[in-house]
A protein has these predicted regions:
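Active-site beta-strand termini and strand-to-loop segments that position acidic
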Residues: 41-46, 107-110, 120
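Conserved beta-strand in the GNAT
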Residues: 49-54, 106, 115-118
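Vicinal oxygen chelate
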Residues: 13-14, 68-111
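Core segments of cupin and vicinal oxygen chelate
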Residues: 2, 8-50
């Protein structure tokens, strides 16, 4: 049976991306021994999906084929986390594909990689 072990994100500045994603998720650095080319972050306690931040010259896309969904319990937590991540260096994205009454907000990390904060308690009325 396959499991997801590592999700790799392309970034232009590995050190900056490491600081952002460590602050965002509270992950620990497992290794940065790749000469500035890559860093692997692990969840606290070491169990769960890791994130590899790998240097890339490819620009991010406005509609990426793969992105992270970060989950929160309610709308208040969603807004608080969005504000916290913006303070860490993320940007809110004025996305052209929001549905009516979305349960998510779209942000971009300092490299422009888009991700969502999803409200798991969203009332679809």
């Amino acid at each position: 049976m396959l499991t997801i072990g590592v999700l790799a994100l392309g970034v232009s500045d590995v050190e900056r991306a490491t600081a952002f994603w460590r602050g965002a998720l509270g992950y620990d650095v497992r290794t940065d021994g790749f000469g500035g080319w890559s860093t692997v972050l692990v969840p606290p306690g070491g169990s769960g999906t890791m994130i590899a931040l790998q240097r890339s010259e490819t620009p991010p896309r406005d509609h990426p084929r793969l992105h992270l969904d970060l989950h929160v319990e309610n709308a208040a937590e969603q807004e608080a986390e969005a504000q916290r991540l913006v303070a860490l260096g993320a940007e809110r994205v004025d996305w052209d594909s929001y549905p009516d009454d979305p349960d998510f907000v779209v942000l971009a990390d300092p490299d422009g990689n888009r991700f969502c904060i999803v409200d798991l308690g969203h009332d679809y009325g």
